[in-house]
Amino acid sequence: MHALTIAGRELRALFISPVAYVVLTLWSVIAGTFFLASLIGFQERMMQLQQFQMLQQIQETNLNDQLIEPFIGSMWVILLFLLPAVTMGLVSSEKANGTEELLLTSPISIWDIVLGKFLAGSGFVFVMTAIIAFFPMLLFVYGEPELGKTVSGLVCLLLVSMTYVAVGVFASSVTRSQLIAFVLTLVLLVMLGLMLPFLVDITLAGSGVGRDSGISQAVQWIATGSHVDRMLRGLVDTADLAYFAISSAVFLLLSKAVIESARWR
């Protein structure tokens, strides 16, 4: 109950701040631009296929593979750079405003505080996901995309967003500066989402260890990219769902440990 109260308060605070509207505006404009560009590219490919009478290729053309999957995949990458602005003040603002001590000395548990912050951020990314869902839904009016793949892609975007919110809560808990929290979250997300497998592959290649090694496979599991790719293709696996749940739990537990340590200082 305390967690929901904190979540409601934080979510209202987010939507009062101009940062939320800047993020949502940028998110909507970028999404609209990417979707329109993808749609134009798809129409041009279809016209070329019709021009050369490549009927088999036209029949095999899939809206999900050619349009929806690349669109949601692109927005996942954009998320890495916008989400830190949403999460940077979730905990650090309490420290900067001097209200952290009030929270720590209240009967509210540390876990309620962490969970409340996380739920507030999750509520915000739900709105972001709903904005993205609007664009693929338009295709159902004029075409026949696969509903299962479309829903899987949107659920994937929501799950990875919630995982990144947990990362942001952790980064925000280690500092009183929102700027530092922003930078730290950005670095962690870029590493987790994009750079980690690449850096490990380079390191292992230099040491003569193959990509099939245990280390490489472990890093591939830790990085979000492989899990996102599978779900965008409509392949929903319990291992991928477990990954998002475990990753979120780990960063929330780390956040709890950091905040709890402040109580005993």
Predicted regions and their residues:
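Hydrophobic alpha-helical transmembrane segments of multi-pass membrane transport/permease proteins
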Residues: 18-46, 77-82, 188-193
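Aromatic- and glycine-rich beta-strand/loop motifs that create alpha-glucan
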Residues: 1-24
